[in-house]
Design a protein with these regions (language model features):
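Repetitive beta-strand solenoid architecture
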Residues: 151, 179, 228, 313-315
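Disulfide-bonded cysteine-rich modules in secreted/extracellular proteins
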Residues: 298-304
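Serine endopeptidase catalytic core focused on the charge-relay Asp
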Residues: 1-213
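Short, solvent-exposed loop/linker segments at the N-terminal edge
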Residues: 305-321
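Short beta->alpha transition motifs characteristic of CBS
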Residues: 92-95, 183, 222, 239-245
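C-terminal subregion of chymotrypsin/trypsin-like serine protease catalytic domains
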Residues: 89, 118-131, 139-141, 148, ...
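Catalytic nucleophile loop of clan PA
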Residues: 76-84, 218-240
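Append "Rare intracellular matches occur via the same short Y/T/C beta-strand/loop motifs
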Residues: 4, 321-322
Length: 322
């Protein structure tokens, strides 16, 4: 039995038309939908808990595994200039953000041990899955292959998430990092220790960053799509479009430039660019640091007052020195 309730404004009673596009029956444990996928990515992938990942602890908390329409992608929780905790997830346009209304976004799907790179097997995290179901489409554009959705609910404080920062200048990064879920596996981290290269893909000029080859024996795979690329200053500068990188080769990956996604390649409407959503205050900022909603902030509400002291002596004492 299914009960559907429709609430109408007083002046629209009886005038609404209800369409139900599909019905999803969640009869299986979320981990069984596509399996845990632990250790299904290439053995060269590096768990985020390994020592190389420690400087990226905050950014790691922003990355989610996306299960949508029977496929897997990666997304990143991003900050906006209002810093109001709006739960925007940045991913790839080819991950179909328009159809993520029933997607499952899993946070903190990380191995508790450094078991990657053929050292030992990675492990699934213990406890209940930290998930949020469903999102609303916000914006996307094929030119730089970006997608933006808003989660149906704000991640609870217990998830200990981080809203990642970004840079929209298009400046070339000296090094780069990608945090992702290759093949839907537990979260991994990849390193490009060389400057990014400009690239043109899909007939669009200068729309991508090219990672010529990954260092530290790392890579990306299917399921990594949509994952963010961070520069040396921990700002997002791109999202994964695709490439030929894999364990055992030295081939390239390509990331849609955040700077082009910002304007949507001069798109005419807000649903084709990031700027309206990630800069709702119209600040004009070219970069924004990330933040943790669990970190208390101090209000700048102090004032300075003049205090007139009386010249009267209220008390006095004489203490002899022995």
């Amino acid at each position: 039995e299914i009960i559907v309730e429709l609430y109408e404004p007083n002046d629209k009673v009886g005038k609404s038309i209800l369409h139900i596009s599909n019905v999803v029956h969640g009869y299986k444990d979320i981990d069984n939908a596509l399996g845990l996928k632990v250790n299904e990515s290439g053995a060269c992938n590096m768990d985020v808990i390994c020592s190389d990942g420690l400087p990226w602890e905050n950014e790691i908390k922003s990355v989610v595994r996306i299960l949508t329409g029977g496929t897997l992608c990666t997304g990143t929780l991003v900050n906006n200039t209002a810093q109001d905790g709006t739960p925007y997830i940045l991913t790839a346009e080819h991950c179909n953000p328009q159809n993520m209304g029933n997607a499952v976004f899993r946070f903190n799907y990380d191995s508790p041990i450094c078991g990657s790179q053929a050292v030992a097997n990675s492990q699934a995290p213990s406890g209940s899955p930290q998930t949020i179901n469903g999102s609303s489409f916000i914006a996307s554009k094929q030119d730089s292959d970006f997608g933006l959705v808003e989660l149906n609910s704000v991640p609870p404080i217990s998830y200990d998430v981080f809203y990642a920062g970004w840079r929209n200048t298009g400046a070339v990064s000296s090094t780069a990092v990608c945090i992702h879920h290759p093949s839907g596996d537990v979260k991994k981290i990849s390193f490009d220790d060389d400057p990014l290269q400009n690239s043109s893909q899909n007939g669009v000029s200068n729309n991508m960053w090219e990672v010529e080859t990954w260092e530290r024996s790392t890579t990306t795979e299917g399921g990594s799509s949509g994952s963010a690329l961070w520069d040396q200053d921990h700002y997002i500068v791109g999202t994964l479009f695709g490439g030929s990188a894999a364990c055992g080769n030295f081939l390239s990956d390509f990331y849609g430039k955040f700077s082009m996604s910002w304007t949507g390649n001069n798109a005419a409407t807000p649903n084709q660019r990031l700027s309206n959503w990630l800069d709702p205050t119209n600040s004009g900022l070219t970069q924004l640091s990330g933040y943790s909603p669990g970190t208390p902030t101090l209000a700048l509400d102090g004032t300075i007052s003049t205090v007139n002291l009386s010249s009267e002596v209220f008390c006095s004492a004489y203490i002899p020195v022995e």
